[in-house]
Amino acid sequence: EGTHELHEMVSSMRSVKESSNIDTRFPHALESFKARQWQLLGQEYLKTTEKYRTNKLFFIDKNPNNFTFIGAIKLAIPNAKIINAKRHPLDSCFGSYKQLFASGQPFSYDLTELGEYYMEYERIMSHWKEVCEGFFLDVNYEDVVSDLDSQVKRILEFCELPFEESCLRFYETKRAVKTASSEQVRKPIYSSSVNLWRNYEEKLSDLIEILEPLLRELPEQDQPKSFVSH
């Protein structure tokens, strides 16, 4: 069941911190959480998100900042499933750069800060892969575009859910969508946004410089032209 970009995970953490009389400031207060606090966190999160959902087995929290709290989510909600939606680093960053967000995400309006944020995201996710093995699934946008059927089945298998044909017709949903993808989810899958960054490569030099360690690891055809020519 779809919801929105929920902020209840952080607010629930603060609530449990205060009710447990933990004086340490958030987020360092999480270091003082014991088994009881983690249990309370899971209960508080599920309780405060009830208003966004019905009685479906699973619901989706699309908040992109949740990646920083994957360890906490695992301790608080052990049966949660984390989907790490990825795409080419330059497409991912450029997509954020050209988007005017309703609030927050100030780093996304500066290519240097955006690149640094993305590198930190990669570092944090590498850590979670080591300590939370099997808890989340990487899904590449480009793979979804090229083979939606296989990727949908892969995601549903990870979530232990049966396949439904309606999953391939997501664009038919009547549900209100309030995130930056509100227009895209009303359309079938399209490929025009794959490698969109190449149209602006000359203007993305600052971003490319920061992301170079990641970009060098990609297949040659996915690297900036300036890399391939050297």
Name these PLM-found stretches.
Residues 1-77:
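Phosphate-binding active sites in nucleotide-utilizing proteins
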Residues 1-3, 86, 165-167:
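Catalytic beta-strand/loop signature of glycosyltransferases that borders the donor
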Residues 2, 87, 141, 187, ...:
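Active-site donor-binding loop signature of nucleotide-sugar glycosyltransferases
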Residues 5-6, 87-92, 143-146:
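Conserved nucleotide-binding/hydrolysis micro-motifs of P-loop NTPases
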Residues 25-57, 96-138, 146-230:
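PAPS-dependent sulfotransferases, especially Golgi type II membrane carbohydrate sulfotransferases
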Residues 59-61, 81-86, 137-141:
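Structured core elements
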Residues 68-71, 94, 149:
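Short N-terminal helix/helix-N-cap motif within the alpha/beta-hydrolase-1
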Residues 73-96:
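Conserved phosphate-donor/acceptor-positioning beta-strand/loop module used by diverse small-molecule
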